[in-house]
């Protein structure tokens, strides 16, 4: 469990975007088995559920090791009014499923979320299947279950196959064996990790000043103070073509002296710094680092 679930006035529920059987549903069940996962149609709705007190946490996917960042999340987090209190990494295993009576010979097209289709692109090409984007992986499984079309299949989780009564035609059809999605857990109130109690991550947003070399100078403090920045992404703010807003993850706690100095230097070249959360680093990070250090490179699935 990535974050404690002490008694609270809010319901023992965790919100997620999608339909029952979605990977977010699976992540919520694995990370918080004592909380009830509740589905919402959009990320905004899942976030609002926490703000309104309908749910204690929101399980929000933020990036995938194969497909990159999840669209729209970077725009929602700054104005969400919530805080990151934990992170969770889910090993994504996509299953090719269809109605009873269908087979690899009968199916012609596959429904799924755009990211899932992209993560299975090589496999679908090899099988000669046409990808058809839908809003959600689990929703695609539901659509197939409601149809009598034996030429249409879905890519979704094993949980979705169980929920919607579909037959798995081919297991683990993702192209990369290291396909992993990182989720952040959002709460209404901040709950910073304790300093000195294990590895810590800090996530923040910043806007650099509109002067030459501002970003270069802003990031210098992290290098000179030995603070490891594990993520840095820019994105355009609404109504402008200037990519001056940045989303960053660093290793360390804001009370750590090196982090303090790095953030202080960052402030000299920024017009805004917003810390979204300081939380325990997932054990997955250490496992991935050890794997990389050992020289074991994740392999692309070829069959």
What would you call each of these model-derived segments?
Residues 1-303:
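Domain-level signature for soluble enzymes in the chorismate/prephenate branch of the shikimate pathway
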């Amino acid at each position: 469990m990535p974050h404690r679930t002490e008694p609270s006035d809010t319901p023992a529920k965790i919100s997620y975007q999608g339909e029952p059987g979605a990977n977010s549903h699976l992540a919520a069940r694995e990370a918080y088995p004592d909380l009830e996962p509740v589905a919402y149609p959009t990320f905004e709705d899942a976030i609002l559920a926490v703000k309104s007190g309908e749910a204690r946490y929101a399980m929000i996917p933020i990036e995938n090791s194969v497909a990159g960042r999840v669209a729209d999340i970077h725009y929602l987090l700054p104005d969400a009014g919530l805080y990151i209190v934990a992170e969770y990494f889910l090993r994504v295993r996509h299953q090719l499923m269809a109605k009873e009576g269908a087979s690899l010979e009968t199916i012609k097209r596959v429904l799924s979320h755009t990211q899932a289709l992209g993560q299975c692109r090589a496999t679908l090409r090899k099988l000669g299947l046409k990808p058809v984007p839908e809003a959600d992986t689990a929703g695609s499984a539901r659509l197939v279950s409601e149809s009598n079309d034996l030429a249409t299949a879905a890519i979704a989780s094993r949980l979705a196959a169980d929920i919607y009564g579909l037959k798995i035609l081919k297991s683990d059809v993702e192209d990369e064996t290291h396909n992993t999605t990182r989720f952040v857990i959002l709460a209404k109130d901040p709950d910073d990790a304790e300093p000195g109690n294990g590895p810590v991550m800090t996530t923040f947003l910043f806007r650099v000043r509109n002067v030459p070399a501002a970003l270069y100078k802003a990031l210098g403090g992290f290098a000179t103070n030995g603070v490891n920045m594990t993520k840095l992404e820019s994105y355009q703010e609404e109504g402008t073509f200037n990519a001056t807003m940045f989303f960053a993850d660093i290793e360390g706690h804001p009370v750590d002296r090196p982090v303090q100095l790095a953030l202080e230097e960052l402030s000299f070249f920024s017009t805004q710094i917003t810390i979204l959360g300081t939380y325990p680093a997932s054990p997955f990070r250490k496992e991935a680092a050890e794997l990389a250090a050992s020289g074991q490179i994740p392999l692309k699935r070829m069959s």
